[in-house]
Amino acid sequence: TENFEITLKIKDNPFKVDYLNYKKKEKNEVILNFKGSKNRNNELVIETFNLNEDENYIKIKDLVFNEKFQISRFDEVNLDYIDDDKQKNSIRLKRNKKKYFLTGSSFNADNLIEDLLSDDDKDTKIIDINSNLKIDVKKIFLDSEYYLSNFKGDILIKNKEIYKADLIGSFSKNKKLKLTINKDNNNKITTLFVDEAKPIVKRYKFIKGFDEGSLDFFSSKKSKKSVSQIKIYDFKLKELPILTKILTLASLQGIADILSGEGIRFTEF
């Protein structure tokens, strides 16, 4: 077994974690400390990882990478920081035997949603964990204007893929977002209903002045063939050039493929 411990202090250089939308303030100092070992199974075990910047911190316990440098398990992740959008993030992801529990008061998912919808080349297979994930977060920010309250549900992950999910959250005025995923043999059914479509649709720059409306999405995927349907109701639209209408559908289809872990592509509507 090879043991190590490293401490880094960063003050004059920039430092950021894009996935979490975390960025060090210009004149602040970030202290990174991590210790771990490499075991006989060729696994890299990070026993503790700590990032501290004033009142911001990221803490990880017993993070294990397999020989392919994929995350095979971890015991606990604690995040408490103000991100680059000035939003408060305070969540904990903790393992209890084979189940994981995500809890907390708030998390800004804006940057995460943007990455998922726009990047079809990103390798999402870095995590190799088969587990049940139970979620209970009081507030999820979708952007600077919209957020979900009491975001709860369960996700079942097998072979780096979501097999089952049932998630629900509330917008203000008692409007809802509901996502379900069910895989049976080779058929995967995905449904997404959003009472406030704007935080999703506005991310497509060729749609101008979209407001109000709800989004209803259904996808059935069997083997490599998927059939999807997207409906948007009761919305206002200032401008949508005719030549981009098909592009709109093609881009929104990316939601289905992201949820299926396949990258952005579409077969038919």
Where do the PLM segments sit?
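Membrane-proximal interfacial segments on either side of biological membranes
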Residues: 1-269
